[in-house]
Amino acid sequence: VGDKAINFNRRDLIATMGAAAAGHALIADSVSHANNPAANVDDRHSTIKITGMRATWVNPNVFLRIETNHGIIGWGDLKGVDPRVSKPLAESLFELINGENPTRIEHLWQKIFRAHRDIRGGPFLIHTLAAIDMALWDIAGKLWGVPVYRLLGGPTRDRIRVYHTKQAVKIPAAPEEHSGTPAAIDAIVERIKDARKKVGPTGAVMFDAHSAIPPATLIQLASALKPYDLLFIEEPAVPGNIEVFKRLKQHISIPLAAGERDRTIYEMLPYLLHRCLDILQPDCCHTGGITSMKKIATLAEAFFVPLAPHCTASNLGIAASLHVTASIPFFLIHEFYPENGGFNPKGIMRMEWKVDADGYVGLPNGPGLGIDVDEKKLEEEGKKPQTYRWPGRTLKDGSIADY
């Protein structure tokens, strides 16, 4: 072409191109247009970094406070394991997230989960990871000024069904040792019969076996409980042997629920593949946090299995679990004990939960988790001596039992 100037306008250029190339040009033109919001997205929070973390032990929980260079902090609830181990573990894991962008939540979850091949998936790591993950979601929600459930896809319901309401009745536990005799089974049946009478024909009756009843005995018991229309039998067996759960499902017609002692999608998947649970009960503080619980819900959805989340956390953990629950389609009922002092230890949190006349609680507030922590009170309580004793159950003959 030599010295000649080539003066093609965009229309002339597109006219000389093939259809596919023309399409690409038009798309590029649209994307680059100054008035297209999608073409001008600026991540205003790309400069935010994690700068510090404080772990405070107030029985029975360890509370994590994750700090950022923007002055926004996030809170996490670490529970269910020995605080004498989990607190220093959290402080050790901080080196993996220090200086990172807290909104890279999935990336940081994977970084911690995969960091050490020999403790990957173990309860101490996963419970600690759950608290860190919870705090990161709290930060993200506060950054964008929205409740966490908005970041999880938005609400799928207007309110959340819970148990432990004003109408709820908790029947005292049965004897710790189950002989399997007809008399022992009859004693438990009488308790369930009494519960059904108190809540009426439309109330929900649930039986928690707490992994403490031998399979053969539970099969007999479940048969005797059929007339009382149980919503589910919880924790029918100790996790770890899927064959036991398969046997129970084969012989028990009442829906079976479990999952509070299982962690991440990897431990939940066998229940679904073998079709031996009707309801999954992940605990947000046990299973890897908000990130993990959301994945479990999606996994269960593919099998049309609803969640009935286990939750014996502080108000922080309750809020985290409710945020996930607000965003998932397959849901049954949520464990809920906010009036118990153990869920607001020493009164360090400010959060009001209002249960309506039908037994539902409203969607959790925001921004973030929506929980206010009295840091002065937390610091005061954290300076006091804290104690912990390993739980356990011993039978009358001195042997050790599951519980």
Label each PLM-derived region with a short phrase.
Residues 69-146, 402:
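Metal- or metallocofactor-binding catalytic centers and their adjacent structured scaffolds
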Residues 8-26:
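N-terminal export leaders
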Residues 91-95, 100, 107, 223, ...:
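Shared catalytic-loop signature of beta/alpha-barrel
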Residues 369-403:
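Extended hydrophobic packing segments that form well-structured cores
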Residues 27-60, 66, 73:
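C-terminal segment of N-terminal export signals and the immediately downstream linker at the start
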Residues 159, 163-251:
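Metal-dependent enolase-superfamily TIM-barrel catalytic cores that perform enediolate-based chemistry
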Residues 1-8:
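N-terminal secretory signal peptides
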